[in-house]
């Protein structure tokens, strides 16, 4: 079964590259500007793909608008994926905001603050 896992990982990487390109070049919705695809999880049967993304803004309203824009663009992204990927059926896709970038940024802030306090 390691061969199947390799295929799933390879497909996830290809989906990440293609979705990033599709969002940049094909989706014209201004709510989707500044979106970076950080990762993709594909189920073992290749039927569903969860696409993780981040945005530059930290405002909650921008996050909601971006999620709405991505939800509206799901059909276009899936049809483009179907034409670009060499697979029988394009997976159902779901966009999820990736909290790990903000979490890492918060940890950096806390460490810097701790470092400044130790220097005093």
UniProtKB/Swiss-Prot annotation:
Q: Name the InterPro entries on file.
A: KH_dom-like_a/b, RbfA, RbfA_dom_sf, Ribosome-bd_factorA_CS
Chief localisation class: cytoplasm
Query: Which keywords belong to this entry?
Result: Cytoplasm, Ribosome biogenesis
Say yes or no: keyword Phosphoprotein present: no
Q: Which GO terms describe its molecular function?
A: ribosomal small subunit binding
- Compartments reported by the entry: Cytoplasm
Give any single GO term for biological process: maturation of SSU-rRNA
Its Gene Ontology cellular component terms are: cytosol
What's its job?
One of several proteins that assist in the late maturation steps of the functional core of the 30S ribosomal subunit. Associates with free 30S ribosomal subunits (but not with 30S subunits that are part of 70S ribosomes or polysomes). Required for efficient processing of 16S rRNA. May interact with the 5'-terminal helix region of 16S rRNA.
**NCBIfam families, alphabetically?**
rbfA
What the record says about family reads: Belongs to the RbfA family.
Complex and partners: Monomer. Binds 30S ribosomal subunits, but not 50S ribosomal subunits or 70S ribosomes.
Protein name, UniProt field: Ribosome-binding factor A
Which organism is the protein's source?
Answer: Limosilactobacillus fermentum (strain NBRC 3956 / LMG 18251) (Lactobacillus fermentum)
